[in-house]
A protein has these predicted regions:
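Ubiquitin-like/PB1-type beta-grasp interaction modules and other compact soluble beta-rich domains
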Residues: 1-88
Length: 89
């Protein structure tokens, strides 16, 4: 039974700029099982993450290069990406 999981998290656009970081590997507790739970956990990580995640109204996510909903399950070693919705013009 797992106690923690390692997830690589990539940030794009405004999130990357706000965090001054394009990727990090995080060790998450066993209570964090989905994309949405990871987003909430990252938001609570520290003041910088909270400011970055709350400044973007809707954050899209991908897991291992595939668009994912908040309910998508995570597994050890997954690569997630968070980014604002793409706007065209």
């Amino acid at each position: 039974k797992r106690k923690t999981m390692q997830i690589k998290v990539k940030y794009f656009a405004m999130l990357r700029e706000a965090l001054d970081c394009d990727e990090e590997t995080v060790t998450i507790p066993e209570t964090v099982k989905t994309v949405g739970e990871l987003k909430a956990w990252l938001t609570d990580k520290d003041d910088t993450h909270r400011a970055a995640f709350t400044s973007v109204k809707r954050i899209r996510a991908a897991v291992n290069g595939v668009m994912a909903q908040d309910a998508a399950a995570l597994k050890d070693g997954d690569e997630t990406a968070y980014f604002p919705p793409v706007t065209g013009g």
